[in-house]
């Protein structure tokens, strides 16, 4: 609980945890501040959850803290975790707020991300985060191809068919995890989404 008696958010618990495991508190503070600054108005817990679900087995918000602390054992683990979170944080902001994007130059990609935002789609974020982190180097054109496939999927399943949007959460997370393995091309990723 915080000073006002409210339960701490998962992001606050994780922040406390990584600081307790860190050997270099100043560096940890610098990285954490950079993550929060990059995210701007985005909820840090939601970002961390999408980030986690992009490279690990699907986890719900209530179990996120318990799951992450299983993986962070040493100061080196803390540093690697924060480096990766920091590396993806601006990218995440740009997919969530394409109209404020910093890094994307492809107008079609920006437009597609805006369309997904209009559709209130967020459950696909782990797929694009996985593409950012994968050993394959995906271009903006690759991201566009996948984002367009996601846009069709979201429109068809959630807008036309009326499925509940969060039903896609596990589906997209499972695809994201496979991007590090057998789904190692844009064609394979799009085929799986279709």
PLM feature spans:
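A cross-family structural signal marking well-folded subdomains
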Residues: 11-194
């Amino acid at each position: 609980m915080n000073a006002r008696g409210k339960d701490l958010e998962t992001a606050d618990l994780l922040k406390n945890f990584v600081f307790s495991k860190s050997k270099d508190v100043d560096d940890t503070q610098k990285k954490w501040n950079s993550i929060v600054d990059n995210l701007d108005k985005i909820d840090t817990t939601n970002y961390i959850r999408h980030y986690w679900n992009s490279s690990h087995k699907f986890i719900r918000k209530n179990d996120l803290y318990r799951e992450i602390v299983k993986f962070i054992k040493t100061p080196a683990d803390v540093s690697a975790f924060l480096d990766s979170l920091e590396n993806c944080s601006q990218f995440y902001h740009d997919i969530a707020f394409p109209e404020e994007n910093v890094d994307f130059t492809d107008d079609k990609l920006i437009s597609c991300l805006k369309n997904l935002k209009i559709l209130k789609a967020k459950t696909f974020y782990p797929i694009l985060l996985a593409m950012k982190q994968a050993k394959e180097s995906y271009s903006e054109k690759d991201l566009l191809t996948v984002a367009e496939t996601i846009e069709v999927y979201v429109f068809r399943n959630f807008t036309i068919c009326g499925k509940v949007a969060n039903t896609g959460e596990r589906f997209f997370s499972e695809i994201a995890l496979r991007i590090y393995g057998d789904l190692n091309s844009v064609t394979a990723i799009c085929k799986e989404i279709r």
